[in-house]
């Protein structure tokens, strides 16, 4: 579906249009050789075992054809960085290899801005802070990540409090590095896991969260062609706003 109408084979998507894949809405903004995609919660970025259809890459291929970077191969065309299936929000897609290399280098040099918002369990002691702790595969469960010294990569997350609620905190996180599950692992490491996180979170939360509350809110980078700094922002999705409202009601009693 494009803007609520059935899509036709070969139909192109234009800036500001909304695309639906398996009922999930994707908003796409174009800036010449890069695309900013607002991914919905519950959508996998690229095909993998158990998720071959209904991915973001499937949608990009359908609407962009072969005009995507090929650096990451046929399974991840245009994908410069990823966000988890149950994380909503922004990611950048490269339309050619030149753009891909430029964006990847900015990520490597830590000049690529990525800001998230999350609801975490408990009340943070300080209004802001930094978690500087290496992340690697959990030796007891290879599907999970953990803070570990051996066979790990440096990882740095800056956080600040937006609003405090009874038993929970609404925070902003800024990534200095971009490791797998970084925010989820780091916040769990300091005792304040992302609410609704079924992997790293707490059991039996007071609020019935349906999946993790983590949204990629802002992305900023130097445009590969114009050399201008540009930013994209994404409004908090309805699911996130719903939980903030619940927390407001709980905290007011």
Tell me the role of every PLM-derived stretch:
Residues 191-195:
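Post-Walker A helix-loop "phosphate-sensing" segment adjacent to the P-loop in P-loop NTPases
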Residues 73-105, 113, 117, 136-190, ...:
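The conserved catalytic core of RNA pseudouridine synthases
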Residues 37, 185, 196:
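Active-site flanking residues adjacent to catalytic metal/cofactor-binding acidic residues
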Residues 53, 128, 152-155, 212:
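A structural signal for well-ordered alpha-helical scaffolds and beta->alpha junctions
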Residues 146, 196-208:
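Short, surface-exposed loop/helix-turn segments at secondary-structure junctions
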Residues 122-124, 177, 204:
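Glycine-rich beta-alpha junction loops
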Residues 1-130, 134, 239-246:
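RNA pseudouridine synthases
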Residues 208-216:
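Active-site-adjacent capping/gating segments
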């Amino acid at each position: 579906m494009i803007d609520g109408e059935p899509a036709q084979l070969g139909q192109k998507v234009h800036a500001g249009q909304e695309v639906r894949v398996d009922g999930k809405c994707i908003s796409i903004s174009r800036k010449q050789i890069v695309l900013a995609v607002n991914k919905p919660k519950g959508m996998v970025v690229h095909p993998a075992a158990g998720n071959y259809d209904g991915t973001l890459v499937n949608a990009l291929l359908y609407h962009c054809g072969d005009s995507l970077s090929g650096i990451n191969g046929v399974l991840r065309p245009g994908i410069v960085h990823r966000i988890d299936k149950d994380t909503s929000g922004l990611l950048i897609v490269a339309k050619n290899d030149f753009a891909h290399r430029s964006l990847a280098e900015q990520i490597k040099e830590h000049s690529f801005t990525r800001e998230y918002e999350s609801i975490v369990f408990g009340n943070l002691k300080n209004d802001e802070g930094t978690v500087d702790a290496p992340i690697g595969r959990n030796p007891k469960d290879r599907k999970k990540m953990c803070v570990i010294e051996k066979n790990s990569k440096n990882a740095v997350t800056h956080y600040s409090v937006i609003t405090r609620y009874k038993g929970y905190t609404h925070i902003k996180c800024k990534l200095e590095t971009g490791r797998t599950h970084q925010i989820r692992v780091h916040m769990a490491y300091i005792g304040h896991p992302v609410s609704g996180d079924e992997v790293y979170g707490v059991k039996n939360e007071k609020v019935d969260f349906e999946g993790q509350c983590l949204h990629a809110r802002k992305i900023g980078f130097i445009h590969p062609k114009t050399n201008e700094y540009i930013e994209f922002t994404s409004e908090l999705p309805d699911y996130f706003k719903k939980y903030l409202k619940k927390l407001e009601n709980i905290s007011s009693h």
